[in-house]
């Protein structure tokens, strides 16, 4: 098959379920639009930033590296994060990969480049600004983008071989529901990987950091939040790597 960005987009559309949702979707600006004219919610300072075209333009080279540096000693540069994602997801061959809250596609395109044959990486985000930037900067023959609500993923159970969400769960309104959805659409034997915030330190420090984060709309998750959630879901090979105020957690679905 001669893979192009256009064929990847058509394949991304064909994966959407149920059929009624797929029928109501439209191709708009180089991505699959599932939200119609609905705008992304902007209840906090952080969410407003993620829906801003100016932030989308500088996200990969300025905004995100700055955010990583603010997470403290041990934060990984973008290149190392991408390499870790590939290792944690165990990417190889013609896999289907879902990158939720993909932003401007800075991970989606890289993940897609690790795939072969009819493999595809689907970047999924609710922000029009981020999706538009992803199409502009990070389209590819195995990378396609969808705008929709990650709390209700439009895919059948066990659709994907690997699913991930990097640097976003602390911003979304219903993060645990998003993780439940990621687990649902992952096939048995597939890998899930997330990177998010981690609440560490003595109680007074946790309180100060928590209040400061909440003021701008960023959640701080307890250290055991996702390892315990994955274990409760019957997942295995659970791994956690804590770096400063960030945690990387991955697991295999049984």
Predicted regions and their residues:
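Short alpha-helix
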Residues: 218-233
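A short glycine-rich, Lys/Arg-flanked "PGG" loop and its adjoining helix->strand segment in the class I
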Residues: 176-188
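Conserved class I S-adenosyl-L-methionine
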Residues: 191-215
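A short acidic, Gly/Pro-enriched loop at the edge of an enzyme's catalytic core
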Residues: 151-162
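N-terminal auxiliary segments of SAM/dcSAM-dependent transferases
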Residues: 2-50
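Class I SAM-dependent methyltransferase SAM/SAH-binding core
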Residues: 96-152
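Conserved alpha-helix/loop element of class I SAM-dependent methyltransferases that forms part
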Residues: 72-93, 110
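A short SAM/SAH-binding and catalytic strip from SAM-dependent methyltransferases
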Residues: 162-174
């Amino acid at each position: 098959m001669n893979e192009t960005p256009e064929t990847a987009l058509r394949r991304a559309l064909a994966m959407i379920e149920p059929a009624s949702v797929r029928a109501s979707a439209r191709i708009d600006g180089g991505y699959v639009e599932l939200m119609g004219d609905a705008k992304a919610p902007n209840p906090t300072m952080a969410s407003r930033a993620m829906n801003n075209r100016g932030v989308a333009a500088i996200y990969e080279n300025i905004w995100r590296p700055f955010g990583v540096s603010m997470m403290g000693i041990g934060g990984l540069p973008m290149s190392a994060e991408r390499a870790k994602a590939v290792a944690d997801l165990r990417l190889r061959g013609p896999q289907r990969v879902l990158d939720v809250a993909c932003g401007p596609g800075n991970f989606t395109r890289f993940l897609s480049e690790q795939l072969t044959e009819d493999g595809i990486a689907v970047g999924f985000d609710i922000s029009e600004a981020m999706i538009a930037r992803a199409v502009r900067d990070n389209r590819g023959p195995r990378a396609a983008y969808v705008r929709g609500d990650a709390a209700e993923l439009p895919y059948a159970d066990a659709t994907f071989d690997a699913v991930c969400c990097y640097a976003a769960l602390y911003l979304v309104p219903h993060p645990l529901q998003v993780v439940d959805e990621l687990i649902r659409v992952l096939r048995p034997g597939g890998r899930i990987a997330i990177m998010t915030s981690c609440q560490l330190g003595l109680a007074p420090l946790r309180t100060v950091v928590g209040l400061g984060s909440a003021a701008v709309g960023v959640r701080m998750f307890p250290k055991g939040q996702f390892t315990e959630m994955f274990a409760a879901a019957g997942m295995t090979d659970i791994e956690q790597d804590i770096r400063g105020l960030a945690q990387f957690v991955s697991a295999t679905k049984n």
